[in-house]
């Protein structure tokens, strides 16, 4: 529905609905009904005879991209089924596929990787999968405000994504396995790059957009790292935030809040799900 949002031409919205409707036909992928039936993501399609083919439905990047499109359609139609299906699928991915480094896949496919992460596998944690997983979680975070999605992104950023980057930042690996060595991947389309060379930078560029988000009169601080941000609240009210921290090496985070003029708004600080004790202070005074 992105073209519909830009043009307001109904034919684009109708086409988006048609695509989703075709999912549930006998020959379609049934991405909605399989999610409702709690089919594991690695089992939502039969294993193809040829890996690199249109029949390969386990491809993680492509499957998540379909669910991203469903979220965009939800934003236009408000159909609660669409959001529910995506949240259920993300739950399956977390329980079945995401490893200790915050990403997943082998040969770019879902494969029940969470319980197999201590076993030798090949071409694991494709950077395109890491990027798309972060993007899907970020969209759900923006829509629901559920900080668990930010937790998933943080784990992926500090582990799988950082592991894909060469020490001098000159190259992004296509695969970053939990053992062995990084694999930079093959050249594609007659160019000196591949898909992960393109999507890796998109993942890094997503971090500042994810770190601070504004919704209504609320500023959400989702990611803790030394940074400065200039944000605009509704009514064109600018506010500047400066974050000083050595997190995650240490557990102290200091945030300076500097609105252009006195105004009332909320600051929502992410408390990671793994944190057993969290203390928030304002001007040195602990808050309840």
Predicted features by range, described:
Residues 1-288:
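Glycan-recognition and catalytic cores of secretory/periplasmic carbohydrate-active enzymes
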């Amino acid at each position: 529905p992105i073209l519909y949002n830009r043009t307001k031409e109904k034919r684009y919205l109708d086409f988006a609905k048609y695509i989703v409707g075709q999912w549930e036909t006998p020959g379609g992928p049934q991405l909605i009904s399989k999610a409702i039936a709690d089919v594991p993501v690695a089992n939502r399609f039969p294993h193809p005879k040829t890996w690199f083919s249109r029949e390969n439905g386990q491809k993680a990047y492509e499957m998540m991209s379909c669910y991203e499109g469903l979220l965009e359609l939800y934003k236009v139609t408000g159909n609660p089924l669409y959001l529910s299906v995506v949240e259920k699928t993300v739950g399956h991915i977390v329980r079945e596929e995401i490893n200790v480094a915050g990403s997943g896949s082998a040969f770019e496919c879902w494969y029940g990787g969470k319980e197999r992460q201590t076993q030798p596998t090949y071409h694991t944690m494709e950077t395109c999968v890491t990027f798309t997983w972060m993007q899907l979680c970020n969209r759900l975070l923006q829509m629901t405000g559920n900080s668990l999605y930010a937790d998933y992104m943080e784990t992926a950023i500090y582990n799988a994504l950082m592991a894909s980057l060469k020490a001098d930042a000159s190259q992004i690996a296509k695969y970053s396995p939990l053992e062995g060595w990084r694999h930079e991947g093959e050249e594609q389309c007659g160019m000196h790059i591949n898909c992960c060379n393109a999507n890796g930078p998109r993942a890094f560029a997503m971090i500042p957009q994810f770190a601070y988000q504004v919704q209504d009169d609320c500023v959400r601080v989702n990611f803790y790292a030394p940074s400065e941000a200039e944000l605009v609240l509704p009514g064109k009210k600018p506010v500047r935030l400066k974050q000083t921290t050595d997190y995650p090496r240490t557990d102290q985070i200091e945030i300076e809040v500097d609105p252009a003029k006195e105004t009332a708004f909320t600051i929502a600080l992410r408390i990671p799900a793994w944190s057993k004790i969290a203390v928030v202070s304002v001007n040195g005074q602990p808050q309840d």
